Amino acid sequence: MLSQIQRFGGAMFTPVLLFPFAGIVVGLAILLQNPMFVGESLTDPNSLFAQIVHIIEEGGWTVFRNMPLIFAVGLPIGLAKQAQGRACLAVMVSFLTWNYFINAMGMTWGSYFGVDFTQDAVAGSGLTMMAGIKTLDTSIIGAIIISGIVTALHNRLFDKKLPVFLGIFQGTSYVVIIAFLVMIPCAWLTLLGWPKVQMGIESLQAFLRSAGALGVWVYTFLERILIPTGLHHFIYGQFIFGPAAVEGGIQMYWAQHLQEFSLSAEPLKSLFPEGGFALHGNSKIFGAVGISLAMYFTAAPENRVKVAGLLIPATLTAMLVGITEPLEFTFLFISPLLFAVHAVLAASMSTVMYLFGVVGNMGGGLID
């Protein structure tokens, strides 16, 4: 069992290695679009500099916007017993097939499943765009499950001998054919169960709003612990960008009333208590350093230079722009238990700050 867990962790580490460079590109691009750093003239949308930076930034988002697909394809590299390249191909085709089935079933029988597939795939909708397919947002959890199923089929069926007249379907084609049939009930079960999980998360909003400091703790804890599932969007999305806390979302409300807050002699917490739900970014700034140092000093001495090369860009990305996936996914696969401890500490940090009267729009990194 331990060896299988280690193999799984090693397989998941392959896509994680793609995050640091992508994070650096996005972080630098965001910096270069900030007028405080480069001046107003260079950040003008009509300037050649701003246009080039925007193009580079879009390329940098590739890994982050396609995380489920990348994790799905990355799993067979470590878990397929043979023909890893062919296993990756089978997983990619099957994962996309699963999402197409979800889309088709959702569009056809959406009312039965309680999912509105006609709405836009935005944060809080429960939907996402995956390789151009509107589908349920199951994040890397769905990707890992489907990839694991197809990889298991590959390990069992890739070498299976078929009759001579069916020889053209032997190998990868046979795996994909069987996986095609398996993806139908998988898509059905996903549509049947996942929206209920999403609705359960949404129902927490009323409790979070009315629970004061406890609500801030639970909010921040769930926002961190649910990152691997994609369900964290249901936690922060409606608070930061939607009307769960204030009309228009905390981010817009903060920008609109910032001058009013600065002129008032009242404590900021009494003026804007809802700002306690936007303190989760502080763990990205301060917690990232602790996570990185822990991984560095627990690494074997001969590997510390390599580990530092991975951790430094990931940590800077988390601290500056609040993109924590490169660091937290590495952390998650190394020690899931400590990732849960990290979520507890992040929640406790936000709650203590809130109790001391600190509120505001602090959901991102230092630049935010």
Curated annotation (Swiss-Prot):
CC terms in the record's Gene Ontology section: plasma membrane
Keywords per UniProt: Cell inner membrane, Cell membrane, Membrane, Phosphotransferase system, Sugar transport, Transmembrane, Transmembrane helix, Transport
Functional note: The phosphoenolpyruvate-dependent sugar phosphotransferase system (PTS), a major carbohydrate active -transport system, catalyzes the phosphorylation of incoming sugar substrates concomitant with their translocation across the cell membrane. This operon may be cryptic in wild-type K12 strains.
InterPro entries: PTS_EIIC, PTS_EIIC_1, PTS_Glucose_EIICBA, PTS_IIBC_a_glc, PTS_maltose/Glc_sub_IIC
Domain PTS EIIC type-1 per the UniProt entry, residue ranges: 1-368
The protein, known as: Phosphotransferase IIC component GlvC
Membrane topology classification: Multi-pass membrane protein
Subcellular location as annotated: Cell inner membrane
Annotated TM spans: 12-32, 60-80, 87-107, 130-150, 174-194, 199-221, 225-245, 277-297, 307-327, 329-349
UniProt entry tagged with the keyword Cell inner membrane: yes
Note: Is shorter than orthologs at the C-terminus by about 170 amino acids.
One annotated GO biological process: phosphoenolpyruvate-dependent sugar phosphotransferase system
Recorded domain comment: The EIIC domain forms the PTS system translocation channel and contains the specific substrate-binding site.
Stretches assigned to the Cytoplasmic side: 33-59, 108-129, 195-198, 246-276, 328
Spans within the Periplasmic topological domain: 1-11, 81-86, 151-173, 222-224, 298-306, 350-368
NCBIfam families for the chain: pts-Glc, PTS-IIBC-alpha
Record bears the keyword Cell inner membrane: yes
Major subcellular site: membrane
Domain of life: Bacteria
GO molecular function (one): protein-N(PI)-phosphohistidine-sugar phosphotransferase activity
